[in-house]
């Protein structure tokens, strides 16, 4: 088995999907979790305005609505959380996403004070924080906030990790990489777009240039520039297609370099890192 085949197997990506079928798979997955753990009464998700959180958010809202209808339990809620750092340049995109998702509850928590406070405390201790590391603090602060909200709403936190992101490790460890459920796992970027189109999303949501937008020195830096490879190549790779040697080498290098992000903390019984 080639490394490409091993990765595809681990990520569970299909070369061809039926968007309607995959929507149902994700919705049922979320509902099954609520049925298994009846004390969980909500799903919580941070909404950025991009493709991934828009899709995960809409799937969660559908699952919650179906649970309310099937159980007659009105306490089930989906909580969408806006988590801007100061003034978000693409706030219009975030509002467009919320209009599409139609969440039961919509909150806005500005993380700037918390992040700047952490950076100031580190500086006071003699630790200089780089722009890159500050970006990771932002991602982790957003997850701290989501878990605080989930604690108040008897909720589980959703993540937006998907195959095209997971394969490159393009997420912050214990930041956006930390969640309870991943309804998009197994889908690559173009497949996520297909699901959004099926759900009737405004094309502006899934045609938006993907960006983590964590570094202040590189505002709005496109994912593809940061990674050095296109999502089209990543999607082709995860679907088992032949891509250029250069793109393949970059993707597999990211996979190997970020392997630690796909595991729980390493114990003496783990050998994947050796």
UniProtKB/Swiss-Prot annotation:
The organism of origin for this protein: Lactococcus lactis subsp. cremoris (strain MG1363)
Pathway: Cofactor biosynthesis; NAD(+) biosynthesis; NAD(+) from deamido-NAD(+) (ammonia route): step 1/1
Subunit-structure text: Homodimer.
Pfam families assigned to the protein according to its UniProt record, in alphabetical order: NAD_synthase
Binding-site list for ATP: 46-53, 160, 189, 211
Similarity annotation: Belongs to the NAD synthetase family.
Gene3D superfamilies reported in the protein's UniProt record: HUPs
HAMAP family associated with the record: NadE_ammonia_dep
Protein name as annotated: NH(3)-dependent NAD(+) synthetase
Superkingdom of this protein's organism: Bacteria
SUPFAM superfamilies: Adenine nucleotide alpha hydrolases-like
Enzyme Commission code: 6.3.1.5
Function statement: Catalyzes the ATP-dependent amidation of deamido-NAD to form NAD. Uses ammonia as a nitrogen source.
GO MF annotation list: ATP binding; glutaminase activity; metal ion binding; NAD+ synthase (glutamine-hydrolyzing) activity; NAD+ synthase activity
Enzyme class: ligase
InterPro entries: NAD/GMP_synthase, NAD_synthase, NH(3)-dep_NAD(+)_synth, Rossmann-like_a/b/a_fold
Keywords (A to Z) from UniProt: ATP-binding, Ligase, Magnesium, Metal-binding, NAD, Nucleotide-binding
Gene this protein is translated from: nadE
Entry GO CC: cytoplasm
Reactions mediated catalytically: deamido-NAD(+) + NH4(+) + ATP = AMP + diphosphate + NAD(+) + H(+)
GO term, biological process aspect, one: NAD biosynthetic process
Binding site for Mg(2+): 52, 165
Residues at which deamido-NAD(+) binds: 140, 173, 180, 260-261
């Amino acid at each position: 088995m080639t490394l490409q085949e091993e990765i595809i197997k681990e990520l569970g990506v299909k070369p061809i999907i039926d968007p309607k079928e995959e929507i149902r798979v994700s919705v049922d997955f979320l509902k099954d979790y609520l049925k298994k753990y009846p004390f969980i009464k909500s799903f919580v998700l941070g909404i950025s305005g991009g493709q991934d959180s828009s899709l995960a958010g809409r799937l969660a809202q559908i699952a919650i609505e179906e649970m309310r209808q099937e159980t007659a339990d009105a306490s089930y809620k989906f909580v969408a959380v806006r988590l801007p750092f100061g003034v978000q340049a693409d706030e219009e995109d975030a509002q467009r996403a919320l209009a599409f998702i139609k969440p039961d509850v919509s909150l806005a928590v500005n993380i700037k004070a918390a992040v700047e406070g952490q950076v100031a405390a580190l500086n006071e201790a003699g630790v200089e924080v780089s722009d890159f590391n500050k970006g990771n603090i932002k991602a982790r602060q957003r997850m701290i906030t989501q878990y605080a909200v989930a604690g108040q709403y008897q909720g589980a936190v959703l993540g937006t990790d998907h195959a095209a992101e997971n394969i490159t490790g393009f997420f912050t460890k214990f930041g956006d990489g930390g969640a309870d459920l991943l309804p998009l796992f197994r889908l690559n970027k173009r497949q996520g777009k297909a699901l959004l189109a099926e759900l009737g999303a405004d094309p502006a949501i899934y045609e938006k240039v993907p960006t983590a937008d964590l570094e202040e020195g590189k505002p709005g830096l496109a994912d593809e520039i940061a990674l050095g490879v296109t999502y089209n190549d990543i999607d082709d790779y995860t679907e088992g297609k032949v891509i250029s040697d250069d793109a393949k080498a970059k993707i597999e290098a990211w996979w190997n370099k970020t392997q630690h992000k796909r595991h729980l903390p390493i114990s003496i019984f783990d050998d994947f890192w050796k």
